[in-house]
Amino acid sequence: MKPKAYAIDWIAVGRRIRGLRGFDMTQADFASRIGVSQSYLSAVERGRNEIGAEVLLAIGREFNRSLEWLLTGVE
């Protein structure tokens, strides 16, 4: 039996990351904490870039969030 394939809504992922960053942290600060550029983070938050596993893991570790939550919004 093949596992089901799920489409990832990158716009929703970007919105969750933007919400996680909040209004008290700049994109530059957030990007620095996860090891990416501010311009890359900006594109991610707008859903224009897909995010690799390494970056998702860095966000999860740094901000104590599960990969499931980052990708689906469900804990």
Language-model features, listed with the residues they occupy:
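Key DNA-contact positions within bacterial/archaeal DNA-binding proteins
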Residues: 39, 49, 68
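Short alpha-helical DNA-recognition segment
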Residues: 23-46
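Residue-level signal for the short linker/turn that defines the boundary of a DNA-recognition helix
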Residues: 15, 24-25, 51-54
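A short, Lys/Arg-rich alpha-helix, primarily the initiator
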Residues: 1-23
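DNA major-groove recognition helix of helix-turn-helix/homeodomain DNA-binding modules
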Residues: 54-69
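Short amphipathic recognition helices of helix-turn-helix/homeodomain-type DNA-binding modules
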Residues: 69-75
